[in-house]
Amino acid sequence: MMSNENFDNDYNLPPPNDSAEDLKIFIKRYERSVDSTLLEIDENKREALEKYIEERDRKMKYEIECNERLQGWKKLAIEREISEEQSGEVQFPRWIDEWANTKLGGIFERIFSKMDSMQNDMNSRFDAMQNEMNSRFDTVQNEMTSMKGEMAEMKVEMVEMKRETIRLNTRIDLLEQKTEARFQSIEQRFNSIDQRFNSIDRRFDSMEQRLDSMDQKMETIDARSCRSIMLTRKLENTTRSDQGYLA
């Protein structure tokens, strides 16, 4: 089987790994391709040659027709020139009138055309400007409508915020009143507690005074007890001595 690379290189080189049979087939196909290419070149050359001959004949025919017309027109011009000289009436060439009419007409036509073009341009620009202004006006109007809606919503929100602020202020006032009342109550309770502490302090002072008095009394009692004990002992000693003496 032939390799798939046989025609990938446009017959520049045979595939390097093909067998001898594959190479023969490649050579035959290459020869057929060369013959087909040469035949196509010959056909194109023949068509080009036929076209060249046809164009040459048409050119020669055209040159002959133009020369015949020119010769006839030149002969007619000479005859009319002789006739005008003999009659003494020399006319301006028609091309001058045609040039003047065409020139002036062309100038006015260009002027009017330019004016029409300018008018159309101005109209189109005016229409474009008007459309743009209308579009911008519509946009601005829509934005204003949207802004009015937003402002209305903001007003509603502001009214609600004012109401909420009033409610909060009322609650704050109530809380302040309650707080003030509670502070006054607490202050009164603290004052009462202070008074009780003062009373307790006074009672402690009185108790201290009483304790001091009791201490003094105890000291007096102790002193008296000591004297009583001493007297008792002395009396006992005296009694014992008297008993010894009596014995």
Curated annotation (Swiss-Prot):
Cellular-component GO terms for this entry: cytoplasm
Keyword Cytoplasm: yes
Coiled coil segments of this chain: 27-63, 138-225
Cysteine pairs bridged by disulfides in the record: none
Entry's localization field: Cytoplasm
Keywords, sorted A to Z: Coiled coil, Cytoplasm
Residues spanning the membrane: none
SUPFAM superfamilies registered for this protein in UniProt: Tropomyosin
Superkingdom as given in the UniProt entry: Eukaryota
Keyword Phosphoprotein annotated: no
Family statement: Belongs to the UPF0612 family.
Protein name: UPF0612 protein P20C8.01c
Annotated source species: Schizosaccharomyces pombe (strain 972 / ATCC 24843)
